[in-house]
Structure formats: structure tokens, C-alpha cells
């Protein structure tokens, strides 16, 4: 199998359940980071196709709920675990080792629940408006932009001392990966939303990445939870910005 195809399949297998997971070395995982936008395309296509075929047509509220459900199933809820963990750690106002203890705790607390409710609510509202407007292409754009933003975040902050996934992702967030992520994100937004909406979306996603990078630097680095929160947050930003544009 060609090396590029192995890395592409590795990215899709890691970020979705639609491609079988593969055994990989640390170098392979780092090389797969360049293919994160492709994994976003796979997720977006899987979320878009049922509705393009008419699933729950004329019932946008039901479609929006199903969209959130399909997105969760396709990704195994991987990124939302990061949302909950990071919300608990940040909401506790803890710093240093205590911050990381909470972040790594598999149990969910009150702030984690609130973070999930806000995140799911934002996705649902944005998707509902998208279904009303009929601009289904945004459903494909959102996951691509989210995973591209994750690559940029990984390039901005080094991994934390207690990070495993973060270390592998940061190692692969080189100039080529950043260029691919930014180019794919901007192009797909321009293809699916008006120019001003694209500008607004980039600004919001930039603010999310900046805020997460600031928090990560304060706490000594990033891990997979930061990246998951970045993906989920930027996906929601695309949907909400497009619904208002």
C-alpha cells in the first residue's frame, strides 16, 4: 500500500468509525495529521448524505437532532469527551497539576455536563437553521474546518508533560499540515457560504483556537482533550455562523 494512502486511512480510522483502526508507529501517527481534513470530509459526507437523500425532509427540527446523533455515531463521540473534560478542568478554576488531575479524570462533573449541553445545543440550533435554509453543503464544511483548526492549535502549543495523543499530533503539525488545513478550511467555506460568512467563521474559529492556546500555555501544554474541544467548538462555530449569514 502506498505510504500516503496508509497515512490517509490511519487518519480516517483514528477520527471516525467508518474506516477500520490500524496499528501505527508514532511517526505514522504524526504523518497522518496532514490528512485530518480528509477525515473531516469523511465525517461531513456521512452526516450530509442521509439528508441529501431526503431523510426527515420538511422536518428541520428532527433533521437537526438526527444530524447531532449521526455526527456522534460517526466519530464515536471522541471529541465531546474532550469538551466535557476541559469544561470540568477549566470550570473548576484549578491550575497546575490539579488542572491536569481533573482533565484526566474519566468521571464527569457539573461543568462537564454544562459544557456538553451548550455544545450540543449550539450544534442543534445551527443545524436546524441550516436545514431550514437548505444549504446542506455546510454540513460537509463544518467537520473539515473543525479538524483543520485542531491541526493549527497543535502547531501553536507544545504537548503537555502528561499528554500522549497531544505529543503525536503536535509532532505532525508541520508547515505542510498547517497549509493543508488552512487551505482546505478556507476553500470549503468559500464553496458553501457567502464571503462575509466565511470571514466571520474564520474570525470565530480563530478566537476559539486562540483561547484554547492561551489556556494550554498557562497549564504547560495541550493534550487530546484540548484538540477534541477545538474540533467540536469550531464545528459548532461553522454551523452557527452559516445559520446567521
From Swiss-Prot:
The keyword Magnesium belongs to this UniProt entry's keyword annotation: yes
A UniProt-annotated Pfam family: CobS
GO biological process, one term: cobalamin biosynthetic process
Superkingdom, taxonomy of origin: Bacteria
Alphabetically ordered keywords of this record: Cell inner membrane, Cell membrane, Cobalamin biosynthesis, Magnesium, Membrane, Transferase, Transmembrane, Transmembrane helix
Coiled-coil regions listed in the entry: none
Cofactor requirement: Mg(2+)
Enzyme class of the recorded protein, top EC level: transferase
Membrane topology category: Multi-pass membrane protein
Pathway annotation from the record: Cofactor biosynthesis; adenosylcobalamin biosynthesis; adenosylcobalamin from cob(II)yrinate a,c-diamide: step 7/7
This protein's GO CC annotations: plasma membrane
Purpose: Joins adenosylcobinamide-GDP and alpha-ribazole to generate adenosylcobalamin (Ado-cobalamin). Also synthesizes adenosylcobalamin 5'-phosphate from adenosylcobinamide-GDP and alpha-ribazole 5'-phosphate.
Family listed: Belongs to the CobS family.
Protein name: Adenosylcobinamide-GDP ribazoletransferase
Species name: Nitratidesulfovibrio vulgaris (strain DP4)
Amino acid at each position: 500500500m502506498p505510504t500516503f494512502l496508509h497515512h490517509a486511512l490511519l487518519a480516517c480510522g483514528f477520527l471516525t468509525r467508518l474506516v477500520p483502526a490500524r496499528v501505527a508507529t508514532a511517526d505514522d501517527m504524526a504523518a497522518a495529521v496532514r490528512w485530518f481534513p480528509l477525515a473531516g470530509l469523511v465525517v461531513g459526507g456521512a452526516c450530509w448524505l442521509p439528508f441529501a437523500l431526503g431523510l426527515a425532509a420538511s422536518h428541520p427540527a428532527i433533521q437537526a437532532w438526527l444530524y447531532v446523533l449521526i455526527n456522534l455515531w460517526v466519530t464515536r463521540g471522541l471529541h465531546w469527551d474532550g469538551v466535557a473534560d476541559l469544561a470540568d478542568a477549566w470550570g473548576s478554576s484549578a491550575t497546575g497539576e490539579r488542572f491536569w488531575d481533573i482533565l484526566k479524570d474519566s468521571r464527569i462533573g457539573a461543568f462537564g455536563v454544562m459544557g456538553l449541553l451548550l455544545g450540543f445545543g449550539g450544534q442543534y440550533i445551527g443545524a436546524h437553521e441550516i436545514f431550514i435554509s437548505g444549504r446542506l453543503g455546510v454540513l460537509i464544511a463544518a467537520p473539515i474546518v473543525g479538524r483543520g483548526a485542531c491541526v493549527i492549535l497543535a502547531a501553536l502549543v507544545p504537548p503537555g508533560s502528561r499528554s500522549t495523543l497531544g505529543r503525536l499530533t503536535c509532532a505532525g503539525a508541520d508547515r505542510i499540515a498547517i497549509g493543508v488545513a488552512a487551505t482546505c478550511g478556507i476553500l470549503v467555506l468559500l464553496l458553501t457560504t457567502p464571503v462575509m460568512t466565511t470571514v466571520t467563521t474564520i474570525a470565530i474559529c480563530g478566537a476559539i483556537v486562540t483561547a484554547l492556546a492561551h489556556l494550554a500555555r498557562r497549564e504547560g501544554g495541550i493534550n487530546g482533550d484540548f484538540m477534541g474541544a477545538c474540533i467540536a467548538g469550531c464545528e459548532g462555530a461553522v454551523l452557527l455562523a452559516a445559520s446567521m449569514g
